[in-house]
């Protein structure tokens, strides 16, 4: 399998996905796209947005997914059910091609035929114009950190609109590049790192090199980079959470490699596994076109992998620790 040249592709996509001088980001046009057919309600915000309904419950033995509802509920002082929906905007570029991604690949290629140039102020205006708008804005993708300016721009736009205290901002990060440090000013990094109404979820795209490379089409050695980048983000003081996907093409050594995965997480912070939510990959929507024999095997093997994760978690943490609300687990101590 030929690997994506991640760093080269990242540079090309960034050049086509952000205009720092005019503070514009290339945002996917969801209306009229293949993705629109998978939505439970029509796109909003002139076709550039969608409302995502987050699900807390998952089929056993998969752990419940409290993100981003529980952090949002804590900040906003609202019941979790009031923040289970989010206003999603997707930047139109991603440097990896995860086969299970729910976004059509033509919305990840920084193609202006399927996207539009918008400022954070324009996105916030579109959001505020929605009559029944969610209390959470999810800056998704794509890979938002190909355009890291987007997050501080959104924070500033919400503040200027007088909405900063009533909206919880959330973003995804696939832990693939150092653009947060390369392209943001000290002031912007400080803003993002200390912003009270912001949370970031970082996705580990596997539990070993083989699963990572299979899932992303990136070089296997970039799996180690994910841990290095998370360590740097942790130093910012940002409110961080994690996802992990356990789809893997090979069943041999799952228990051993899962133990090593937790070792590496705990080397970053002893409580980090308690802030990580494993995601069960499902075969639906645009994903169905990408599923062949290998992917079917991976979908089955993730069920073995989650048992290994649960066993390791039970061996390393008490029942009381595992039942703590995710927001009660500090990574700053």
Placement of each model-derived feature along the sequence:
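Auxiliary Fe-S-binding modules of radical SAM enzymes
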Residues: 1-45, 221, 228-333
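N-terminal [4Fe-4S]-dependent radical SAM core
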Residues: 12-90, 99, 103-109
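Short strand->helix junction
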Residues: 108, 144-145
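Conserved AdoMet/S-adenosylmethionine-binding subsite of the radical SAM
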Residues: 124-128, 145-275
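Glycine-rich beta-strand-to-loop/alpha-helix junction loops that act as flexible
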Residues: 139-143
